[in-house]
Amino acid sequence: MSKMDGLSTGEEEDSTFTSISLEDDTDHSLKSWRSRAESLLPKMMNADMDAVDAENQVELEEKTRLINQVLELQHTLEDLSARVDAVKEENLKLKSENQVLGQYIENLMSASSVFQTTDTKSKRK
């Protein structure tokens, strides 16, 4: 057989091709890669976790700030509502007192001779 037809003897194989054993190199290369990956994986996971933790921490702080702001606004709103109720009550009280005073003044005016019409006096002249 010719070299083109394939290898017929071990001599042709040895002279044409160099046999390289890949098993040891592959195992060593794979072990080396696996070792590097295993050593990098915790670092990457820790870095990822740190990034996630930092992001979560920022989000948590923002949520806490917003919750505190909402609670403060709710308390302010409750205080304003209580103040409005107090002002309404005071307004009703003052209206009632004004009506009483108005009625009292009207009664005094009708009973007083100073505020009587002067028709009788003008007829005497």
Curated annotation (Swiss-Prot):
Acyltransferase is among the record's keywords: no
UniProtKB keywords: Coiled coil, Cytoplasm, Golgi apparatus, Membrane
GO biological process: positive regulation of macroautophagy; regulation of protein complex stability
Compartment(s) of residence: Golgi apparatus membrane; Golgi apparatus, trans-Golgi network; Cytoplasm, Cytosol
InterPro entries listed in its UniProt record: SCOC
Cellular component annotations (GO), alphabetically ordered: cytosol; Golgi membrane
Keyword Transferase: no
Pfam (any one): DUF2205
Chain intervals for the UniProt region annotation (Disordered): 1-31
Record membrane topology: Peripheral membrane protein
Coiled coil regions in record: 43-101
Function: Positive regulator of amino acid starvation-induced autophagy.
Subunit structure: Homodimer. Interacts with ARL1, ARL2 and ARL3. Directly interacts with FEZ1 and UVRAG. The interaction with UVRAG is reduced by amino acid starvation, but the complex is stabilized in the presence of FEZ1. Interacts with NRBF2.
Similarity annotation: Belongs to the SCOC family.
Protein name: Short coiled-coil protein
Organism: Mus musculus (Mouse)
